[in-house]
Amino acid sequence: MEIFKKASSIIETLKQQGHEAYFVGGSVRDLIIDRPIGDIDIATSALPEEVMGIFPRHVPVGLEHGTVIVVENGEPYEVTTFRTESEYEDFRRPSSVQFVRSLEEDLKRRDFTMNAIAMTEEGEMVDLFAGQEAIQKREIVTVGNAADRFQEDALRMMRGIRFVSTLGFSLETKTKQAIETYGHLLEHIAIERITVEFEKLLTGTYCVKGLKELVETKLFSHLPYLQMSEERLLKATQYNWDSFETDIEAWAFFLYCIGEEHPSVFLRQWKFSNKKIKDIVAVLLTIRKRKEKDWDTVLLYKTGIHIAEMSERVYEAMIESYDNTSVKRVQTLFEALPIKSRQEMNVTGNDLLNWANKKPGPWVAEMIQNIEEAIVQGNVVNEKECIREWLQECNLL
């Protein structure tokens, strides 16, 4: 409760001014489940203008949605006015938001009962939709009619399966049936929003369970490049996903499991950044090389430790070996390299020009590369005079 105590003064101040205020959302859910708590959110009957008038230190980040960031004890907290939403447009966003003075009206618009629990500053739960019962049963249940909730915002279906992966809960029967019925509405949702949820699914503690639900609800058939991937997705559930430490590894392994032959095309379709695409593809290419031969100094040097570690963890998952000794071996090999990057070489292009007494040209870059590989392979010591002598012995000067 310590994390909530730091924000309690906000609720107390709002109440002193005649308003209602409660902790709400994921932080309350995670407190009940006894999971690490992230951002603390507060809901209040005070209008945004009233919140800003009460708290001098604020940032008006989302006034149209009723959200003001209040800075208290050096920490930022989202304070949002109780609100209800009108008819939704395109199965993803409300056409308008109305501020209300009722906590119940605010909670009833939320996605799942476990996320619709409010808490007073004293720690008393306000549970109007049996959210605690759902948590006790480890079930994901929509607030009210599941069909209505998913037709309001189709992304909620993806969020539901993401929660299966992150919490290990199961979809309640009617909720699951509604996902099967309304899954096609996911095609109205921007792929960027789907990608965020899918990544949380892949990196969840119960990823295998989440992937199984993705198949059982047929939701996968409404996702880009996955329409025909049922058998391959089921194959993915046969592996252990626990060894991955980054989202890059999870995506690389996922692409391996579904047999994606054009990973760059897939990732661009899912709107990944160029940097992330580059890293994921680098891991997959490194694994291809790794299958052909074990690590040697040149391969490890050219790959770099970051990609090498990730590649090894994914490769270990592929061959179903999870003792982590191979990753440690890669780290040991890398630490033993004479140089870790070209910047550590004790020779420059100018040195070569002076020694060879030749005009600049492509030969300089080629010779630098030859020297670099020789240093990495241990054929020459990374000292200027040693490099010069080695070049002379090899008749390269």
UniProtKB/Swiss-Prot annotation:
The answer to keyword Repeat applying to this record is no
Positions of ATP binding:
G26, R29, R110, D153, R156, R159, R162
Q: Which reaction does it catalyse?
A: a tRNA precursor + 2 CTP + ATP = a tRNA with a 3' CCA end + 3 diphosphate; a tRNA with a 3' CCA end + 2 CTP + ATP = a tRNA with a 3' CCACCA end + 3 diphosphate
EC number per UniProt: 2.7.7.72
Q: Please indicate which superkingdom the organism of origin belongs to.
A: Bacteria
Q: Which of this chain's residues are annotated to bind CTP?
A: G26, R29, R110, D153, R156, R159, R162
Task: Give the residues the record marks as binding Mg(2+).
Answer: D39, D41
Biological process (GO) annotations? RNA repair; tRNA 3'-terminal CCA addition
Cofactor(s) the protein requires to work = Mg(2+)
One GO MF term, please? ATP binding
* Keywords for the protein's UniProt record, in alphabetical order: ATP-binding, Magnesium, Metal-binding, Nucleotide-binding, Nucleotidyltransferase, RNA repair, RNA-binding, Transferase, tRNA processing
Q: What class of enzyme is it?
A: transferase
The family line of this record is: Belongs to the tRNA nucleotidyltransferase/poly(A) polymerase family. Bacterial CCA-adding enzyme type 3 subfamily.
Q: What is this protein called?
A: CCA-adding enzyme
- The organism encoding this protein is Bacillus cereus (strain 03BB102)
- What lineage does the source organism belong to? Bacteria, Bacillati, Bacillota, Bacilli, Bacillales
